[in-house]
Amino acid sequence: MRVAEQLGMPPPATIQNAYSLLCRSFDSDLAEVCSPRNHNVGLLPWSVLCGGLLSGKYRPSARAEASARFVAFEDYMRRWHPAHARDVTLTAADEYAAIAERAGLSPAELAILWCRTRRSIAHGSVIVGATTLAQLQQNLDAFTLPLESLTDEMIEEIDAVHMRCRDPSNSL
């Protein structure tokens, strides 16, 4: 901020950080400085599906396709990889998927919708990734869901999972 001011340039408008149901370090590290009361820098989150872990396709009850990233690439995003992730990470991902199912949403829709409702997110914007056109369409469909689709009851359930499985990516 100071450098931009010293150079007579506009200040940063957004910051890109990994942010998801499983990775919330922004909330404790940067949310206050980025808030509208301070520097008003919105978060533009990436890795909202944690490399696909929050898509539901790696649940114990699911059978991931051979072309799925974590199947095809053993070392891809190791902290989220089902073969390498901590048990608490997999437990949280499975519990979030169950919340989505009870609400009639896909796990990916829940993960994206949750990010969109966070106060720090820049204009509800979220960076999504996909391997297939079908995945891209599912991710885009999540942006058509009204924010009210995430009910207070669902938020309470999400918060309860978070309290039991607090930021599992921070303890690698």
Residue ranges and their predicted role:
Residues 3-8, 31-34, 60-64, 143-146:
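Short, hinge-like loop/turn segments at secondary-structure boundaries
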Residues 11-16, 40-44, 125-127:
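Structural preference for beta-strand elements that scaffold enzyme active sites
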Residues 7, 48-49, 82-146:
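Conserved short secondary-structure transition element at the edge of the structured enzyme core
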Residues 33-99, 121, 168-172:
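Glycine-rich, positively charged active-site loop/lid region within alpha/beta enzyme cores that binds
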Residues 18-25, 47-58, 114, 131-132:
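Glycine-rich beta-alpha junction loops
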Residues 107-114, 151-161:
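Short, well-structured alpha-helical segments that form the helix of a local strand-helix-strand
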Residues 4-12, 38-39, 104, 147-150:
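Short helix-capping segments at alpha-helix termini
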Residues 1-29:
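Glycine/proline-rich, positively charged
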